Amino acid sequence: MSAGPTCEKPCFQVCGGGHLDRHLWLQAAPVMGRTNAARQTVSTGGVAANIASHLAAAGGAVRFTGVQPPQEAPAMVTRLAASGVDATILPLEGEVPGYSAVMGPDGELLVGAAAMALYDDVLPAMIMPHLDPTAALVIDVNFPEDVVLALARSGASGRPVFAAGTSVGKVARLRPCLQHLHALVLNRDEAAALSGNSDAPVDVLAQDLALVLADGGVVLVSDGGATAALASRTGSVTLEPPQLRVVNANGAGDAMAASLFSGLVTDPGMALATRLQIALAAGADFAAGPPHPDLAEPS
């Protein structure tokens, strides 16, 4: 796979959700019905925007295309530029998108709230003219199914198309896209929902989905601190993620996805086992430390 002949660096076009994430980190076990002491981080969020920032941090030349209400667009461009991402934020009237999460003292998500109605109004005609046609394309599933499918089909030009699951509720939008994808990263719940096989182990889920991807495509299925799997049409490997004290589990999957996608472009001949090990290490590094400096700012 190639990122495109015009790029001196590995070149990526990322498209999807880009908004503000607010994380409230509880300092002790939650007490319902009471005010709980917490610290807050405000970050550039959205699966696609997070992956874009990780790809840029790894040395990629990254372009991002997303939407915001007109008054919010300049600030999002500035935030992504600070992470090394060249952003095109298209104006779209509507509610400001955002995500808020309450995290337990163990670093695990307690409850999240997503206000994403703006993304439901995105149309293919708004997005497609603003994409770099030569770069490897990375998408999430925040936009409607017809937009996601149009993005996936753009791989017919010869560039690789990579996708990351966004939520169990949205992952079905990928079903008509699978044959166009060269890599797919999901958690276990998303993979089970997409395959319709809730009882299968992660290696079976990954292998079944890999069989319907584009030729040479790979599927990574993670399961938190349990076994993860990476599969192609011809085989699969499993690995236990590194054992660690979790500080920030929310967002580790985006770091893992970025690592896999970057490696597919920069080293297409890498063995599956090595790819999985590197991707899991990237997710573990994110989960074990404070929010990535390019992704979060104390507030």
Where are the regions a protein language model picked out?
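Gly/Ala-rich phosphate-binding loop of Rossmann-like dinucleotide-binding domains
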Residues: 56-57, 156, 265
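Conserved phosphate-donor
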Residues: 183-185, 190, 205-241
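Conserved post-catalytic alpha-helical subdomain immediately downstream of the catalytic base
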Residues: 215-218, 240-299
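Glycine-rich phosphate/adenosyl-contacting loop at the front of the ribokinase-like
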Residues: 1-65, 74-75, 240, 246
